[in-house]
């Protein structure tokens, strides 16, 4: 048996004494009084900040939301099934933040920016606060560049600009998500980073959206943030802020970003659940008093930055679900008053086969034609006017039996214009194609066709124009104007294609 000599023992003790480093660590701790329903009440934690992250003994993390005189109300960012009454909790000294980097592009993540697509970790050197202040007045400039959605009804009559916030509102199953996802598909090749935030949706719906993005090849410039219906309320409440933090990261790096919140009604419901469990006083529809601030501080982060900050932009398309078309409910009116306009989707139009089911009469963009190229302004003004007159006449024509020829012609034109606004899902059109379509309709070239032939003719016309008159597209994309030369080319193409089409139909 080996024996230790006295001098060896003294050397070991001497080394230990020399290596001893006295370090005092002050940790702010507390004790769990009560836990359940995703909420924990903590005694102690005297110096905790509002919104600070706290860590439980079994490593669950929570956010301190209610700072009361004798306890702290914490919402859990996990199920917290292993937390026990009497266990200790420590304050971390950090406000909620997430890592950010270019590597997030093409990934599906949760509200804590952790990947959930099974493709391994994401490397990130920087981090951003989930809740950051919105850009101030001096940091912004007015919206002037178009954010093309690829949908004629929107780009012509309810134009969206880069840095705008445009609400998409409507009942369930009216195509709200389809409008938003088509807008993402249309950003292909436009150098726009897209963030799609899914809040409280079915996992199957989110999977369907991600599959569409992958098939269409748009995942390379898109980040999907998903918290499904079975996620804790805290994470559903945080998901939009996580998406905003990622979009901001790119915006401040002089890039253009588009963020979709699908949908904010679910976020408000998650926040209502948390607030009621924290015993905050309920207000209208049992929502807490600060539910307006919940959405305003999120949507104000969308901006068009000034030239001094690099002219980056963040365009927000929040989605809100209504109950049987009631836009005067609490959350819809709140979000309408925060955003720069709304696109109203109607269940009646959807069921009658008009898709996208946009009710042009009550939809509005408060940025207006500032967010359109000159060519679009030139052709879209007439379209708006004719559709408005058609809507008026249509209501009147239901009661009048004998209509004069002019009124009949106007009704026929209106029906064809309504037909040209119809589009299939995942088939966005370029601006040049939209200008062609609108010009053909408003100048009466479709009047001689049957309503059922309109769509087929327009598809063939766009293909024919691309192959036989490529200079038309060059003129519009380079000058952004519908010049006389472009008009001559278009008229020729319409006449040539009309002759071919009518011959085709006869045979």
Curated annotation (Swiss-Prot):
Compartments, as annotated in UniProt: Plastid, Chloroplast thylakoid membrane
Residues carrying the site annotation Required for activity: 363
Catalytic reactions on record: ATP + H2O + 4 H(+)(in) = ADP + phosphate + 5 H(+)(out)
Spans through the membrane: none
Keywords: ATP synthesis, ATP-binding, CF(1), Chloroplast, Hydrogen ion transport, Ion transport, Membrane, Nucleotide-binding, Plastid, Thylakoid, Translocase, Transport
Enzyme class: translocase
Membrane topology: Peripheral membrane protein
Positions bound to ATP: 170-177
Gene Ontology molecular function, alphabetical: ADP binding; ATP binding; proton-transporting ATP synthase activity, rotational mechanism
Enzyme Commission no: 7.1.2.2
GO cellular component: chloroplast thylakoid membrane; proton-transporting ATP synthase complex
CDD domains: ATP-synt_F1_alpha_C (cd18113), ATP-synt_F1_alpha_N (cd18116), F1-ATPase_alpha_CD (cd01132)
Major location category of this protein: plastid
Family label: Belongs to the ATPase alpha/beta chains family.
PANTHER family in the record: ATP SYNTHASE SUBUNIT ALPHA, MITOCHONDRIAL (PTHR48082:SF2)
Function, as annotated: Produces ATP from ADP in the presence of a proton gradient across the membrane. The alpha chain is a regulatory subunit.
Subunit relationships: F-type ATPases have 2 components, CF(1) - the catalytic core - and CF(0) - the membrane proton channel. CF(1) has five subunits: alpha(3), beta(3), gamma(1), delta(1), epsilon(1). CF(0) has four main subunits: a, b, b' and c.
UniProt-recorded name of the protein: ATP synthase subunit alpha, chloroplastic
Upper classification of the organism: Eukaryota, Viridiplantae, Streptophyta, Embryophyta, Tracheophyta
Gene: atpA
């Amino acid at each position: 048996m080996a024996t230790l000599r006295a001098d060896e023992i003294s050397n070991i003790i001497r080394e230990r004494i020399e290596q001893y480093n006295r370090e005092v660590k002050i940790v702010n701790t507390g004790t769990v009084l009560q836990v359940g329903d995703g909420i924990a009440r903590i005694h102690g934690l005297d110096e905790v900040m509002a919104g600070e992250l706290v860590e439980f003994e079994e490593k669950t993390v929570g956010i301190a939301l209610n700072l009361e005189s004798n306890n702290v109300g914490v919402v859990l960012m996990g199920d917290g099934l292993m937390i026990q009454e009497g266990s200790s909790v420590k304050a971390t000294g950090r406000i909620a933040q997430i890592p950010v980097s270019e590597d997030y592009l093409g990934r599906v993540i949760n509200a804590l920016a952790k990947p959930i697509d099974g493709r391994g970790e994401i490397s990130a050197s920087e981090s951003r606060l989930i809740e950051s202040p919105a850009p101030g007045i001096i940091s912004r400039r007015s919206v002037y560049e178009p954010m093309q959605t690829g949908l004629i009804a929107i780009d012509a009559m309810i134009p969206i600009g880069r840095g705008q916030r445009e609400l998409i509102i409507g009942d369930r199953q009216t195509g709200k998500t389809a409008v938003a996802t088509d807008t993402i598909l249309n950003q292909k090749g436009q150098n726009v980073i897209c963030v799609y935030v899914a809040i409280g949706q079915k996992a199957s719906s989110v999977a369907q959206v991600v599959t569409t993005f992958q098939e269409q090849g748009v995942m390379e410039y898109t980040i999907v943030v998903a918290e499904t219906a079975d996620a804790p309320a805290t994470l559903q409440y945080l998901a939009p802020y996580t998406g905003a933090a990622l979009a901001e990261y790119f915006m401040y790096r002089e890039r253009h970003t588009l963020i979709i919140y699908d949908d904010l009604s679910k976020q408000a419901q998650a926040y209502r659940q948390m607030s009621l469990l924290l015993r905050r006083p309920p207000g209208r529809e049992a929502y807490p008093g600060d539910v307006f601030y919940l959405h305003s501080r999120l949507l104000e982060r969308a901006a068009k930055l000034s030239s001094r900050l690099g002219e980056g932009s963040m365009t927000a398309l929040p989605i809100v679900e209504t109950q049987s078309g009631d836009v005067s409910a609490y959350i819809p009116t709140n979000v309408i008053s925060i955003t720069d306009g709304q696109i109203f989707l109607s269940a009646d139009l959807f069921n009658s086969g008009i898709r996208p089911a946009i009710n042009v009469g009550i939809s509005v963009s408060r940025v207006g034609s500032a967010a359109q190229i000159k060519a679009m302004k030139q052709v879209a003004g007439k379209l708006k006017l004719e559709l408005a007159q058609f809507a008026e006449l249509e209501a009147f024509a239901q009661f009048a039996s004998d209509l004069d020829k002019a009124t009949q012609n106007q009704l026929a034109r209106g029906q064809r214009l309504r037909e040209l606004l119809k589009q299939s899902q995942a088939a966005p059109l370029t601006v040049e194609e939209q200008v062609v379509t609108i010009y053909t309709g408003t100048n009466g070239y479709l009047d001689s066709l049957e309503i059922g032939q309109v769509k087929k003719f327009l598809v063939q016309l766009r293909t024919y124009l691309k192959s036989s008159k490529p200079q038309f597209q060059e003129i519009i994309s380079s000058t952004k104007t519908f010049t006389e030369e472009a008009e001559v080319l278009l008229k020729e193409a319409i006449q040539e294609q009309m002759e071919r089409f009518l011959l085709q139909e006869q045979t």
